[in-house]
Every structure is written in C-alpha cells, then in structure tokens.
Amino acid sequence: MGHLSAPLHRVRVPWQGLLLTASLLTFWNPPTTAQLTTESMPFNVAEGKEVLLLVHNLPQQLFGYSWYKGERVDGNRQIVGYAIGTQQATPGPANSGRETIYPNASLLIQNVTQNDTGFYTLQVIKSDLVNEEATGQFHVYPELPKPSISSNNSNPVEDKDAVAFTCEPETQDTTYLWWINNQSLPVSPRLQLSNGNRTLTLLSVTRNDTGPYECEIQNPVSANRSDPVTLNVTYGPDTPTISPSDTYYRPGANLSLSCYAASNPPAQYSWLINGTFQQSTQELFIPNITVNNSGSYTCHANNSVTGCNRTTVKTIIVTELSPVVAKPQIKASKTTVTGDKDSVNLTCSTNDTGISIRWFFKNQSLPSSERMKLSQGNTTLSINPVKREDAGTYWCEVFNPISKNQSDPIMLNVNYNALPQENGLSPGAIAGIVIGVVALVALIAVALACFLHFGKTGRASDQRDLTEHKPSVSNHTQDHSNDPPNKMNEVTYSTLNFEAQQPTQPTSASPSLTATEIIYSEVKKQ
C-alpha cells in the first residue's frame, strides 16, 4: 500500500480551509456518547470550487477511517483510507486526486464538478473492531454564464405578428426570469411563458412593446442577466395632421403647410391640390398666394413596409377679409336700473365690416330669455323688464372667419326700492290703522262733548230742586219745638237723573258705565 502523506501536504488548500482545519484540530473534543455525523460546507457548491465534508463527534481510540462515494460502504467506491497509527492515507478506486483527508477524518474535495454531486459515507474503525458510519451529501451547480436572448421575429408588424423570445443557454436546475423596461413581467393576456419560462411570447405586438427585454438565469450558487434587446415594431402610418391649423389667409401671404403621420419606418408624403398631384414632400410652400389658391389641400402618407396609406384633407380660403378685427365698444342706455320697472339697451359698436357679433354674460354665452332680445345682426341687446338676476357683467365679441376680438366688460346694476312685505306691514295695512285711529279719536271727542253738555244741564236742574225744598226745610226747623214728641221725623228725598250716551271704545276688560245713575239725597228734620 502506498503512502499519501506526501501528496497530502502538497495539496493547495485556500487559507479559509487551513484556518478551519486548524480550529478543528485545536478545539475538537467531542463527547463519547454523541452520534457520528458529517456536514457539507457549503451544501450547494459552484462548479470549480471546493467543498469540505466536516466530521462531528468522532469516537476515541480508533484504528482508522475511510471515505466512500455513495450511501454505503463499497470497496470499489472507496475514495481514501487513513491509518491513525501510521498517519498514512491510502487512495481508493474512486480517488480522483482532488481529495484530501485530515487527521480529524474531514474530507476536502477541490475543483468540484457536477459529477461530484451526491452522497458520501464515512466509516470509522474503532479499537474494539466495531465500525461506525455516517453519510453526508452536497450539490454541485454550474457557474452560470451570461445569458442571451434570441427572437423569431425582430421586425414584427403592429397588430399582426407575434414574437417569441428565448433565453439561452438551456441549463439544468436553473430558474428563468424576464424583465421588460427594467420591471418584472406584468400580468397580461398577450404575454405567455413556456418551456420552463425560457420562452416569452408576445401576442399581437403593438408599438408600445418595443422593450427593452432582458432575461435572467439563477441557481442556488449564481445569477446572471442578459444584455437588453429591443423590438423594431413596424406600424402606421396613422391619420396625418396638417399644420398650421389656420384656414383663412390674406392675398399676398405665403402658404406653408407641413404634414406628419406617426409611422415606423417614417412615412412617405405627397400633396394634392383640388385632387391634382403637386409634389412628393412632407412640406408644401406656395409664396404670394391669391384667391385662386383657395381649395382642398390633401396630404397622402404611405408606409412601404406595412403597406398602409392614410390621407387628410384641409380647406384653404384666401380672402380680402381683415385678418385683425378691431376691439368693439359697448354703450348702455343706463348702467343702474330699477328691477321689475326699467328696461335697458346695450349696443355693441364696431367699425369693421363683414363681421358677426355675439354676446356674453358672466363669462357665459348669453342665455335664452323672453326678456332678452337681440336686434338684427345682434348689434343691440334689449332687456325688458330688468330683473334682479340680470345684474352682472356683459361684453360683446366681434369676429369673422379670420380673427375675433372682445369688448371691455360693462357692469349692469339692478336696484329694488320697494319694501319687502315679509319684513313688515303692507302699505294698505298701515293706511287702515291710521284711519282707524283717527276715527276712534273723533268718536271719543264727540262722546266727551255730549257728556259735558248733559252734565251741566243736570247740575242746573238739581240746583232748582234743592231751592224749592229749602222753605220746607226751614219751616220744619222753625216748627221743631211744636212737634209732638212721639211724631216721626220727616224725610225728604231728591232724585238726580243723569243720562249720557256711551261712547264707542275698544274692547276692554273693564266694565262699561251704566246709562243712568240715581243719587239719593236725604234731608232729616231736627
């Protein structure tokens, strides 16, 4: 049996492995009852790198140990054996020269390949000739190269073709991801993934699908992304537009028209005037135009790749009408009016001819109203009668097919002088109250005059009655001594009657005076 000790020390081991080995040899002191195990460091290994099969809980008092490729001890698949007494390693049939065994039974495999993927079994031979085994494993993945994207159609036609992208190369145990415009793949019914996500298909390509597109490949040990790829989507032409948008021109002006239609590749243009071909250019220029240049101008756009054609027709009118309309003026019959009483006339004045007039109220077109009338030609606006809601700003606009201009605004103020009925008594109610008060005062005055008159007459009559009874009283007085003692005293009664008309007064809680009051006056003889 040959000795492996010399090759063992000639193997180049990275400094990380040497550091790990030193630590294992220095501090390894497993408990005697622990189970023998192995650990792959790392478990997932990149192809061309190295892996260490680290042993834990190695028993004491051993004769030696051996490593085997697979999940069981098989002499034909022995990698290496190690005798502790001689500290010599002996290669087995499965040894590739890339393996290194350490005194602590750990096994280092360098420059691994995908064929190294799998299980490895350690067998330890104890001094009591009882063997103990432990199995570990690791997986070797390729170091992924930079992928690339292939396409079945790099110049698809919009709304017609489909495009299939494929991420190359095909690699086992690899994940494929796609990116569009530096974003992960969106959810869309037009995007389909197949072949383990290696193939991305775009259905019914549009001009917005130009990209860029990228594919990324990943495995547990590496990742890489392709260079971006863009699509050259052919489309168009869309309906062309002619600029500028002006329709009216003055004689003597220069006519310069430009045509544009979105298209890929760029469209080819041609011009027709009144149906007659003029030239094959994108721009059309006619100097010093006259009224004879009025007519229909047609722009024709063509895409030779898509085979599509589009046209646009624009009408040009050359006229003597003023290209600039002067600013009009508004004149008002009055600017402050009384609501529901007054009317007002607003007149829009301009020196231009061949123009039209329209009116605006509070930044809006003049509303339709039976009270608002426009004269022929819209020169005068009449409002009759003016209402509260008619207050605000008015202005007029004069325009022709070439230009327009607006007047300064004018403010219409609407006043209301009548007192609102809901805030007090109506004028009729106030007049009724005044008349009632005057009538009441007159009745009281008449009643008082009657009372004073009848009162004076009553006092005079009473005075006469008293005078007539005085002699009797006197006689009774004089004859007092002659009266018999038992004779009753004579009593004379005077009656005063006062009659007065009761005046009309408002209803009151106090009782009314009686029509007649009787006063009795008693005169006794002494």
From Swiss-Prot:
<feature type="domain" description="Ig-like V-type">
    <location>
        <begin position="35"/>
        <end position="142"/>
    </location>
</feature>
<dbReference type="GO" id="GO:0015721">
    <property type="term" value="P:bile acid and bile salt transport"/>
</dbReference>
<feature type="domain" description="Ig-like C2-type 2">
    <location>
        <begin position="237"/>
        <end position="317"/>
    </location>
</feature>
<dbReference type="GO" id="GO:0007229">
    <property type="term" value="P:integrin-mediated signaling pathway"/>
</dbReference>
<dbReference type="GO" id="GO:0046983">
    <property type="term" value="F:protein dimerization activity"/>
</dbReference>
<feature type="domain" description="Ig-like C2-type 3">
    <location>
        <begin position="323"/>
        <end position="413"/>
    </location>
</feature>
<dbReference type="InterPro" id="IPR050831">
    <property type="entry name" value="CEA_cell_adhesion"/>
</dbReference>
<feature type="glycosylation site" description="N-linked (GlcNAc...) asparagine">
    <location>
        <position position="292"/>
    </location>
</feature>
<feature type="glycosylation site" description="N-linked (GlcNAc...) asparagine">
    <location>
        <position position="378"/>
    </location>
</feature>
<dbReference type="InterPro" id="IPR003599">
    <property type="entry name" value="Ig_sub"/>
</dbReference>
<dbReference type="GO" id="GO:2000346">
    <property type="term" value="P:negative regulation of hepatocyte proliferation"/>
</dbReference>
<dbReference type="GO" id="GO:1901143">
    <property type="term" value="P:insulin catabolic process"/>
</dbReference>
<dbReference type="InterPro" id="IPR013151">
    <property type="entry name" value="Immunoglobulin_dom"/>
</dbReference>
<feature type="glycosylation site" description="N-linked (GlcNAc...) asparagine">
    <location>
        <position position="182"/>
    </location>
</feature>
<dbReference type="GO" id="GO:0007155">
    <property type="term" value="P:cell adhesion"/>
</dbReference>
<dbReference type="GO" id="GO:0016324">
    <property type="term" value="C:apical plasma membrane"/>
</dbReference>
<dbReference type="GO" id="GO:0090331">
    <property type="term" value="P:negative regulation of platelet aggregation"/>
</dbReference>
<feature type="topological domain" description="Cytoplasmic">
    <location>
        <begin position="453"/>
        <end position="526"/>
    </location>
</feature>
<dbReference type="GO" id="GO:0005912">
    <property type="term" value="C:adherens junction"/>
</dbReference>
<dbReference type="GO" id="GO:0051896">
    <property type="term" value="P:regulation of phosphatidylinositol 3-kinase/protein kinase B signal transduction"/>
</dbReference>
<feature type="transmembrane region" description="Helical">
    <location>
        <begin position="429"/>
        <end position="452"/>
    </location>
</feature>
<dbReference type="GO" id="GO:0001568">
    <property type="term" value="P:blood vessel development"/>
</dbReference>
<dbReference type="GO" id="GO:0098742">
    <property type="term" value="P:cell-cell adhesion via plasma-membrane adhesion molecules"/>
</dbReference>
<dbReference type="GO" id="GO:0002682">
    <property type="term" value="P:regulation of immune system process"/>
</dbReference>
<keyword id="KW-1133">Transmembrane helix</keyword>
<protein>
    <recommendedName>
        <fullName>Cell adhesion molecule CEACAM1</fullName>
    </recommendedName>
</protein>
<dbReference type="GO" id="GO:0032869">
    <property type="term" value="P:cellular response to insulin stimulus"/>
</dbReference>
<dbReference type="GO" id="GO:0043116">
    <property type="term" value="P:negative regulation of vascular permeability"/>
</dbReference>
<keyword id="KW-1015">Disulfide bond</keyword>
<feature type="glycosylation site" description="N-linked (GlcNAc...) asparagine">
    <location>
        <position position="208"/>
    </location>
</feature>
<keyword id="KW-0677">Repeat</keyword>
<dbReference type="Pfam" id="PF13927">
    <property type="entry name" value="Ig_3"/>
</dbReference>
<feature type="glycosylation site" description="N-linked (GlcNAc...) asparagine">
    <location>
        <position position="274"/>
    </location>
</feature>
<dbReference type="GO" id="GO:0010594">
    <property type="term" value="P:regulation of endothelial cell migration"/>
</dbReference>
<keyword id="KW-0968">Cytoplasmic vesicle</keyword>
<dbReference type="GO" id="GO:0070372">
    <property type="term" value="P:regulation of ERK1 and ERK2 cascade"/>
</dbReference>
<dbReference type="GO" id="GO:0009925">
    <property type="term" value="C:basal plasma membrane"/>
</dbReference>
<keyword id="KW-0472">Membrane</keyword>
<dbReference type="GO" id="GO:0006469">
    <property type="term" value="P:negative regulation of protein kinase activity"/>
</dbReference>
<dbReference type="GO" id="GO:0016020">
    <property type="term" value="C:membrane"/>
</dbReference>
<keyword id="KW-0732">Signal</keyword>
<feature type="signal peptide">
    <location>
        <begin position="1"/>
        <end position="34"/>
    </location>
</feature>
